[in-house]
């Protein structure tokens, strides 16, 4: 039986070789995976908000895209990943409330923008994404392959894709 590590909101997990790392209920939050195909080291971050500084660095650093991504990177490198081989995949960032006009409240969009900016700053390639829209997502990172299975519910219809 395959071991599954479940990642909650504002948390992350890393692993090597075998098993699944998953997170459920990505709405405006983003799920970011990092994976090294050679060492089969990977990790997943479930971030709630874009930038720690904007919120006074309050609470758990994994709650924020910018500081959480740094934590995730540090941990996959500790397990033997090479920064130069890492590939990132990005999910979530939905607009959960339809009539929001304020950019300040478009958390999903800001989470996605921050994730892309931080990945670029760190020199990590973004190789796949499924972001935006209105549906919630669940993702499963397979540590043996680096593939991410995504389930999305839109208007009662379940859509599954592998990235």
Curated annotation (Swiss-Prot):
Domain of life the protein comes from: Archaea
Enzyme class: hydrolase
Protein name from the UniProt record: Probable chemoreceptor glutamine deamidase CheD
Any one GO MF annotation of this record: protein-glutamine glutaminase activity
Alphabetized InterPro entries for the sequence: CheD-like_sf (IPR038592), Chemorcpt_Glu_NH3ase_CheD (IPR005659), Cytotoxic_necrot_fac-like_cat (IPR011324)
Organism: Pyrococcus abyssi (strain GE5 / Orsay)
Family to which this protein belongs: Belongs to the CheD family.
Function, in words: Probably deamidates glutamine residues to glutamate on methyl-accepting chemotaxis receptors (MCPs), playing an important role in chemotaxis.
Source lineage: Archaea, Methanobacteriati, Methanobacteriota, Thermococci, Thermococcales
């Amino acid at each position: 039986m395959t071991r599954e590590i479940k990642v909650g909101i504002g948390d992350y997990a890393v692993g090597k070789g075998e098993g699944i790392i998953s997170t459920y209920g990505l709405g405006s939050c983003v799920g970011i995976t990092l994976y090294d195909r050679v060492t089969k080291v990977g990790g997943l971050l479930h971030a709630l908000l874009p930038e720690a500084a904007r919120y006074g660095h309050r609470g758990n650093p994994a709650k924020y895209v910018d500081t959480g991504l740094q934590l995730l990177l540090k941990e996959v490198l500790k397990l033997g990943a090479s920064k130069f081989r890492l590939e990132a995949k990005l999910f979530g960032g939905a607009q959960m409330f339809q009539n929001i006009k304020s950019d300040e409240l478009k958390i999903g969009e800001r989470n996605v923008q921050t994730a892309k900016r931080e990945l670029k700053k760190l020199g990590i390639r973004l190789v796949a994404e499924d972001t935006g829209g209105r549906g919630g997502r669940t993702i499963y990172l397979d540590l043996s392959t680096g593939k991410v299975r995504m389930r999305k519910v839109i208007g009662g219809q379940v859509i599954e894709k592998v990235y």
